[in-house]
Amino acid sequence: MTPEEFYQALAKHHINLSAKQKEQFDLYFKLLVEWNDKINLTAITEEKEVYLKHFYDSIAPLLSGYIPNESLKLLDIGAGAGFPSLPMKIIYPQLDVTIIDSLNKRIKFLNLLADALELDKVHFYHGRAEVFGQDKNFRAHFDLVTARAVARLQVLSELTIPFLKVGGQLLALKASAADEELKTAQNALNLLFSQTTSSDNYQLPNGDGRNLTIITKKKETPNKYPRKAGMPNKKPL
């Protein structure tokens, strides 16, 4: 997917990028490739692949109408080089984006990237989701949480749902259908007072399969969740 094909694909969804937004995506690509040599951010570095498998893939929830261009508080867990939240932020500047990542070198890259792209209302924190999820400044604080290929839903739900306000939603972007994951995650969702709103399979323009699963928080999360760092993965709910 060339940059021009990327713009055209967005235009079909009535998203027409300004010259500044196009420049932001171009600079994002260039900085990603430049810094990838230093800190190994991604295995995908060819321009057409980055525009398809990072940029376009990240904005699927926008194209599907699941995220409006409003000043919602969005948390991205394990965003790596900023996916999916920063491509969303470029397109919908009103979003207030927070990223938590466990590797400090990625946080340094994100700070540099945000400055270069002139993004405001973006906040980056180094640490574990299990720790921040028990911090009153983060817990039950967000309208949306996104996670792209981070963990199985059984584990991911405990890492993310405590951050949501009641009525808030987890948007889990997956590389394949989530039917089996949802079955396995059902006990965790019950314990976390959340339920599946939708799970939709779709394709990228090149035919690659993807899945977007949305989980809605129904009641306050019990205080004991998330458990200590490492426990959600070692002993899933």
Curated annotation (Swiss-Prot):
UniProt function note: Specifically methylates the N7 position of a guanine in 16S rRNA.
- Region feature (Disordered): 218-237
Q: List the disulfide bonds.
A: none
Q: Which family does it belong to?
A: Belongs to the methyltransferase superfamily. RNA methyltransferase RsmG family.
Question: What is the name of this protein?
Answer: Ribosomal RNA small subunit methyltransferase G
Q: Which UniProt keywords apply?
A: Cytoplasm, Methyltransferase, rRNA processing, S-adenosyl-L-methionine, Transferase
- SUPFAM superfamilies attached to this UniProt entry: S-adenosyl-L-methionine-dependent methyltransferases
GO molecular function terms attached to this record: rRNA (guanine-N7-)-methyltransferase activity
